[in-house]
């Protein structure tokens, strides 16, 4: 195990009865990496991502996050989750709260920030994504692209060390998806550690430091975007890329 790994995954297995959604997955994520995970439906990509903060509890294996074994039942997972932002396909904003309250709730409750401090940080982040004028709107008054940009900056309000993205643009049309990808590219350039399950190959080529291809619960191939897309090593990966590019 590298000493500079932010997350180390060892022999991760997730079974649902006879089905192995994850089949002995091992990898390391270093600070500042932008790791894009691709693969066909049912390959285990989202299960892997959701296992990293124990939204899916692995059947066996180990996840070390910032030196702590978070698969140990004695560990306070909520403490570690505060350092792992998560952005979902369906935004998961609280519908009954304004955008500003969506963004300040967790920092005030969990990080014990004052209302003024939490609101100042939220407004600064809203400005970064061009949505400061929507602070007092409710989620139902926003477009899908706006909601997802809010979901990203809401995650940033908690000052996480890594953000996990589970198909963040798959519920959006290409134009709205483009708005979200622009925010993610800027975030990648800022040095944020990001792990992203996506079908957006253009984003993977442009912003990823590493691309991982998963199939049947295993990591089949991983490489830099340049090597991965121009010179895939396995037939399975070649066939997948040929079918989508």
Residue ranges of predicted features:
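C-terminal boundary and immediately downstream tail of ABC-type ATPase nucleotide-binding domains
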Residues: 213-216, 222, 226-245
């Amino acid at each position: 195990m590298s000493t500079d790994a932010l997350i180390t995954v060892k022999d991760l297995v997730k079974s649902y009865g006879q089905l192995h959604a994850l089949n002995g997955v091992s990898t390391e994520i270093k600070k500042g990496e932008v790791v894009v995970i691709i693969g066909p439906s049912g390959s285990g990509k989202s299960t892997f991502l959701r296992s990293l903060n124990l939204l899916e509890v692995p059947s066996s294996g180990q996840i070390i996050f910032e030196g702590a074994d978070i698969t140990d039942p004695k560990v306070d997972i909520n403490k570690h989750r505060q350092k792992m932002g998560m952005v979902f396909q369906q935004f998961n904003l609280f519908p009954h709260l304004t955008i500003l309250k969506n963004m300040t709730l967790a920092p005030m409750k969990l990080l014990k920030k004052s209302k003024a401090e939490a609101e100042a940080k939220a407004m600064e982040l809203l400005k970064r994504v061009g949505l400061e004028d929507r602070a007092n709107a409710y989620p139902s008054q926003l477009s899908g692209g706006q909601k997802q940009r809010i979901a990203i900056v809401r995650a940033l309000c908690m000052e996480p060390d890594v953000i996990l993205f589970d198909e963040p643009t798959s519920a959006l049309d290409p134009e709205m998806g483009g708005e979200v990808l622009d925010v993610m590219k800027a975030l990648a350039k800022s040095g944020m550690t990001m792990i992203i399950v996506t079908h957006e190959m253009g984003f993977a080529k442009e912003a990823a430091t590493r691309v991982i291809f998963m199939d049947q619960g295993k990591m089949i191939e991983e490489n830099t975007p340049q090597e991965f897309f121009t010179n895939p090593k396995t037939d399975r990966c070649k066939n997948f890329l040929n079918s989508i590019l």
